[in-house]
Amino acid sequence: MNRTSILALFVALLANAADVKTVHFPSEDHRTSLVAYLFEPAGPGPHAAIVLLHGRAGPYSSLAKGVYDATTLSRRHKQWGDFWADRGYFALLVDSFSPRGFPAGFPAGSYGDRPAEVSEQTVRPLDAYGALRYLRAQPGVIADRIGVQGWSNGAMTVLAIMSDQAPGKPASGFRAAVAEYPGCNMDSLKGEYHAYAPILMLIATNDEEVNPLTCEKFARRVKAAGSPLEFRIYPGAGHNYDDPESKAQSVPGNRRATEDTFQRAEAFFASQMKQ
């Protein structure tokens, strides 16, 4: 898919934008009331669903200017929510940061300074399981066909969620997961990592924020231990390669990675959840 095709995809998603509903539900931490944004597919259903987990910058546009709601979601999150709704899925974008007092998220390079209350390995998984509980209670959702997708910090949450040591209830957890450019340092886990359901991990060679070699070694180790993990590394792509902004998509490696990610993620979830 060339640059024109990528732009055509983005335009098509805008033209077929799904309705976005603001919803609230408790985290499985039993003390946080979460806000989330539900993209609804057309048709009577029932439908499978995908939980979306934002990165360190949070779910909102950098131009939000203090307004943090459905009208100021970042283009990337809106794009993916529309993409899944257009293909017959509910998509639920969970805001883990605003309810804890950090609506604008965190800048690059701030990992060591972030509070433990937004930990991607021990706290945010409980938010994801809260989202899972919420979706399973919705009449139009197929309760045993719910996947999860995350970016960067949210992708680290995905890896934590899919571990058989996950905070929450992994034995009755997500059907499948997509993790885009995680860091792969799973400090919260003891011993080998074992996934309880299939994972698609997507990494960029020119990532400016995380070391792709760490993820490559992690993926090889996890696969060797018998976990169902599919790994793809994109030459010439950087962190946040699927950002629809023109600056990111002007990089050829990012465009190629974006094209493949949309196609690969769609095929992956279709194979795992529409059986």
PLM regions and their residue ranges:
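Acidic beta-to-alpha connecting loop that harbors the catalytic carboxylate
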Residues: 205-208, 236-238
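Short beta-strand/loop motif that positions the catalytic acidic residue
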Residues: 195, 201-203, 207
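Primarily recognizes the serine-hydrolase "nucleophile elbow" in alpha/beta-hydrolase
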Residues: 59, 118-195
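C-terminal catalytic histidine-bearing segment of alpha/beta-hydrolase fold enzymes
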Residues: 228-275
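N-terminal cap/lid segment of alpha/beta-hydrolase-fold proteins
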Residues: 18-45
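Sec-dependent N-terminal signal peptides
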Residues: 4-14
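Serine-hydrolase catalytic machinery in alpha/beta-hydrolase-like enzymes
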Residues: 35, 49-134, 243-248
